[in-house]
Amino acid sequence: MARTAPRADGMTWTDPACPVARTLDLVGDRWSLLIIRDAMDGARAFTDFQHRTGIARNILTDRLRRLIERGILERQTAPTGRRQNYVLTDAGRDLFAVIVATRQWGERHAFAPAETHSVLVDESGVPLPELRPTDAQGRPVDVDTTSVLHER
């Protein structure tokens, strides 16, 4: 199932055997997730990320560096050759479901019923259906019907 291991040489893992903890160690701070969100929405240049998030330059520089080191983003020379662009790697693109699930959770729990918010739509302008995990037979699963198998 794993495609590529993150470039995380020298990292100290919060919980080495837990995929959730490792993912959060790699991308879990607020600014990194917002940068990933914006990269998925077309941000490429340093100034794109800065304007969209309002992040301070020094923090943005640090987060972009970390995301590159960890294999989430890569730096590419812009077509003009005058600046660097930041684009998602395959590992970064694989975070799409995480961003969508986070967005959908926020739509349900972080806004008042009549409060307006942005909406993620498909190519035809239709809002995405709610993400729901299923088992191997396609049946819905949730916290009550799953468990974690701890490898020994």
Could you say what each language-model-derived stretch is?
Residues 46, 50-77, 82:
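Canonical helix-turn-helix DNA-binding module
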Residues 23, 33, 70, 99-109:
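Alpha-helical linker/hinge and terminal dimerization helices associated
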Residues 16-56:
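N-terminal helix-turn-helix DNA-binding core of bacterial DNA-binding proteins
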Residues 1-4, 100, 104-152:
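C-terminal regulatory/oligomerization modules of transcriptional regulators
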